[in-house]
UniProtKB/Swiss-Prot annotation:
This is Argininosuccinate lyase. It is an enzyme of class 4 (lyase). The lineage of its organism: Bacteria, Bacillati, Bacillota, Bacilli, Lactobacillales. GO terms for molecular function: argininosuccinate lyase activity. Keywords: Amino-acid biosynthesis, Arginine biosynthesis, Cytoplasm, Lyase. PANTHER family: ARGININOSUCCINATE LYASE.
Length: 460
């Protein structure tokens, strides 16, 4: 039997089955069922308080909605394509439960402000979980950084050995990236904390509703100030997706380095078996698949952002059916970033750090060349001249297989007689790292200060 459309009074014919399926959104917007019921309960409570609905009718609707909430939690609700979307499906189920009085729930409300409210609630509910998941990863970074303050490794520019650094310093760089992610998502909460309900289709309503009461019931900071903006605004979704894309880009950069460092050529890290897989043909393989998946999933999250930007860019005010396309990318982004954060945290927490291999990589790579140039500058040689001198020494060393610390003192004293035995002390990788104690530098004291500051942030 055909379903009677709640909007069908103006129509003489129904669309083809395939058109109905094309227009339906229940396959994905059912993920907002809890938010839709939450919004409806607040709306009908407001209608009761303002006496727009008789108390008896409102109480009957409230009882029915609460029963649907229980059934939803128990997984007992069944949705149909014939009822198009989550709003119509739940209203149909409410009608089955309490009869025609269910139709009064939609008084002073449109699906336009209803879906916008659902979407706000969906993002509002998930933002704290996203922020906490980022902080959980930050805690792992801080813990591992604290254990590796004096672990020496090559620092890179252009993927070439540049200067020796502390592995703890490296990890704290990602902590700072993630802290900016936290701050962006926290700012996202401000724009999400506005309530569209009461804007109706686009122009408000003639009923004497109390939007401030509804906002309070739903724990929103305030209602939207403009009804057109309320039903058409998806900036908060764009912000979430932009933040998610930046977050995933940070995770992807980290995973790229994890992948490289687990290779035989680097050998700095070894992931635990829990976060690795093997090969169906090559028995020796231990592949960093989880890191590769996070790197790969970054593309899809970036795509969701670009997709919604493209959808919205040409929409006239106020609501358009195009906005049905605002949800799937959002839902998928949430389902992508949460396990990605957990996987990266787990990989780092359980990875073996090959400290010896890291340190050895700094011994014959000439990454102490800047130390020698700085040393010469302290002897009164202009830095540019010192730079050129060290460059020549590096070139000579590359040809002869001699490191800077293997050059005889007599050779150094040909450059400047003031050069003493202490030059060899300064050329040690650990000393080079330890001495870089400028604010924010890789010096051990600075890294410890970064870690303490991070712990303070995480304790708030």
């Amino acid at each position: 039997m055909a379903v009677k459309r709640m909007w069908g009074g103006r129509f003489e014919a129904t669309g083809a089955k395939w058109v109905e399926e094309f227009g339906a959104s229940i396959s994905f917007d059912q993920q907002m069922a809890a938010e839709d019921l939450e919004g409806s309960l607040a709306h009908v409570t407001m209608l009761k308080e303002t006496k727009i609905l008789p108390a008896a009718d409102a109480d009957q609707i409230i009882t029915g909605l609460k029963k649907l909430q229980d059934q939803l939690e128990a997984g007992e609700l069944t949705f149909t394509v014939e009822n198009e979307d989550i709003h119509m499906n739940l209203e149909a189920l409410l009608t089955e439960e309490i009869g025609p009085v269910a139709g009064k729930l939609h008084t002073a409300r449109s699906r336009n402000d209803q879906v916008a409210t659902d979407l706000h609630l969906y993002v509002k509910h998930r933002l704290p979980h996203v922020i906490q998941a980022i902080k959980d990863l930050q805690k792992v970074l801080v813990e591992k950084a604290a254990a590796n303050v004096e672990t020496i490794m090559p620092g890179y520019t252009h993927l070439q050995h540049a200067q020796p650094i502390s592995y703890g310093h490296y990890l704290m760089a990602y902590f700072q990236m993630l802290q900016r992610d936290v701050e962006r998502f926290e700012f996202n909460q401000q724009h999400t904390d506005l309530m569209p309900l009461g804007a109706a289709a686009l122009a408000g309503t003639t009923f004497p509703i109390d939007r401030e009461l509804t906002a309070k019931l739903l724990d929103f900071q305030a209602p939207y100030a403009n009804s057109l903006d309320a039903v058409s605004d998806r900036d908060f979704v764009l912000e979430f997706l932009a933040n998610a894309a930046i977050l995933m880009t940070h995770l992807s950069r980290l995973c790229e380095e994890i992948i490289m460092w687990c290779s035989y050529e680097f050998g700095y890290l070894e992931l635990s078996d829990q976060y690795s897989t093997g090969s169906s043909i090559m028995p020796q393989k231990k592949n960093p698949d989880m890191a590769e998946l996070v790197r790969g999933k970054t593309g899809r999250v970036n795509g969701h952002l670009l997709g919604l930007l493209t959808t919205i860019k040409g929409l006239p005010l106020a609501y358009n059916k195009d906005l049905q396309e605002d949800k799937e990318g959002l839902f998928d982004a949430v389902k992508t970033i949460m396990p990605s954060l957990k996987v990266v945290a787990g990989m780092l927490e359980t990875a073996h750090v090959n400290k010896e291999k890291m340190a050895q990589a700094t011994e014959r790579d000439f990454s102490n060349a800047t130390e020698l140039a700085d040393y010469l500058a302290t002897k009164g040689i202009p830095f540019r001249q010192a730079h050129a001198i060290v460059g020549q020494l590096v070139l000579e060393g590359l040809k002869t297989g001699t490191t800077l610390q293997e050059i005889p003192l007599a050779k150094y004293q040909e450059i400047d007689p003031a050069i003493g035995e202490d030059v060899y002390h300064d050329l040690q990788s650990k000393v080079a790292v330890e001495r870089r104690n400028s604010l924010g530098g890789t010096g051990f004291d600075q890294v410890k200060a970064q870690i303490e500051a991070a712990k303070q942030l995480l304790s708030k």
